[in-house]
């Protein structure tokens, strides 16, 4: 099974509470989940947030919407991902997504999942050393066994926070594959980190809804 894990928290330093910001009448994270639901390969979507009180409103909102939630360490996000896999598996493939990307593209997700399947890679992504997709369309696909190996071995705080560096920094150990497009849009910004980013995606959603 392919398990999508949507990483989310309320305590963003640059734009606190952004994942629950209103986007065309619904929380931004639920708008993103609507788009993820259009990716057929994602058999299940789980929101992975922290066990801190600051994330209680997020967890309660997801539960009210019928979205599965796993809660774990705020800083050890890698451990949180393993916990989500254990709680909502069995899953042999995981997909890492972050909840600040309400313009997520189901087609890009499907292509990256298919690339990992076709190559048998331990890790596949549409970013990396050469980014061609806009920031905000990022998707990472990994074998659950590879991520378990990372979680069992690394104690580096950077690896624990950012989940996958232990994999893509070891190309001699883990098989990697990268999805690129012909047109280079790597400098385009569709993610939501700042107030102006939120204004932009609100304008997009208002135009479409």
Regions found by a protein language model. Give the residues of each.
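N-terminal glycine-rich phosphate-binding loop and ensuing alpha1 helix
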Residues: 1-49
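Conserved N-terminal catalytic core of the sugar/cofactor nucleotidyltransferase
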Residues: 30-92
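Short alpha-helix within the catalytic core of nucleotide-sugar-dependent glycosyltransferases
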Residues: 34, 91, 106-117, 144, ...
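Acidic metal-phosphate-binding loop of nucleotide-sugar-dependent transferases
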Residues: 74-75, 101-103
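Conserved donor-nucleotide/metal-binding helix-loop-beta segment in metal-dependent transferases, i.e.
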Residues: 83, 104-132
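Short aromatic-hydrophobic micro-motifs that form the base-stacking/packing surface
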Residues: 93-97
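A recurrent flexible, glycine/aromatic-enriched loop bordering the glycosyltransferase active site
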Residues: 128-139, 183-184
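Conserved alpha/beta core of the MobA/IspD/sugar-nucleotide pyrophosphorylase nucleotidyltransferase superfamily
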Residues: 142, 160-209
């Amino acid at each position: 099974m392919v398990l999508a894990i949507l990483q989310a928290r309320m305590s963003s330093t640059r734009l606190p509470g952004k994942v629950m910001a209103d986007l065309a009448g619904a929380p931004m994270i639920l708008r993103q989940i609507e788009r993820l639901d259009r990716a057929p390969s994602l058999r299940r979507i789980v929101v992975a947030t922290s066990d801190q009180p600051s994330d209680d409103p997020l967890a309660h909102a997801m539960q009210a919407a019928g979205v599965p939630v796993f809660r774990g360490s705020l800083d050890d996000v890698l451990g949180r991902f393993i916990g989500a896999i254990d709680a909502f598996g069995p899953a042999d493939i995981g997909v890492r997504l972050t909840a600040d990307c309400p313009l997520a593209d189901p087609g890009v997700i499907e292509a990256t999942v298919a690339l990992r399947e076709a190559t048998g890679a331990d890790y596949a992504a549409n970013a990396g050393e050469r980014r061609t997709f806009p920031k905000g369309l990022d998707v990472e696909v990994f074998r659950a066994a590879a991520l378990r190996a990372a979680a069992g071995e690394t104690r580096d705080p950077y690896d624990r926070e950012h989940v996958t560096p232990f994999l893509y920094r070891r190309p001699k150990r883990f098989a990697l594959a990268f999805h690129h497009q012909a047109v280079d849009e790597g400098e385009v910004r569709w993610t939501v980190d700042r107030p102006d980013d939120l204004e932009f995606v609100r304008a997009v959603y208002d135009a479409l809804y």
